[in-house]
Amino acid sequence: NVKDAVKDADIIVPNKLIIDKSVLEGSSVKMVCEAATGYNNVDIDYCKNAGIRVTNVSGYSTESVAQHTVALLLSVYEHLDYYCSYVESGEYTRSKKFSHVDCQFHEIAGKTWGIAGLGAIGRQTAKLAQAFGAEVIYYSASGNAYDVLYQRVDFDELLEKSDIISVHCPLNEKTQGLFRADAFKKM
């Protein structure tokens, strides 16, 4: 039981556990240190009203998350699972053709990479996208992000102009349900 586990603690360090009134009420918790960059699992309003400070570990995974974003894109764009299976099956060595191109390859260079959320991870992803030769545009769900290196666009424009979209914004009331079916139809 989380409530019992935290009742006598001054500081708790959760990750993914729901930390809300039902957990915190009647406890001696003075600070919640979320062991992640996102903290949508913490009831911020309750904590604020109860005088409980909330922090996270912003920046701890910026490079690795941006790198993983590019790795996932390359896996999809280059059909890596398909081609790895093709080679591992022995079909490549048995083929009389010089090359096997049943699945089309895509170039990132020259594409428009749209980024939803230009915080630290979004900015790092933008740098990597540019290194591959992509033009970067971004949408700021909060309306607070401004960056002179990249063109800021509204959400619909991001959907319509982007060849690639990666999402790096926190899950909150402004972003929950942002990418619904109607958004995908605009892509």
Regions found by a protein language model. Name each.
Residues A9-D10, V70-L73, Q151-D154:
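Short low-complexity, flexible loop/linker segments enriched in glycine and/or proline
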Residues S58-T112:
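Phosphate-binding beta-alpha-beta segment of Rossmann-like dinucleotide-binding domains, i.e.
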Residues R53-G59, R152-F155:
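Short beta-strand elements at the ligand-binding edges of bilobed clamshell
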Residues N41-D45, S64-H68, Y146-Y150, D163:
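Short, charged, surface-exposed secondary-structure boundary motifs
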Residues S99-K186:
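Rossmann-like dinucleotide/phosphate-binding beta-alpha-beta segment
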Residues R53, S75, H79, E135:
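Residue-level detector of anion-binding/catalytic polar loops
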Residues N1-T55, E160, R180:
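An N-terminal-biased, well-structured beta-alpha scaffold segment characteristic
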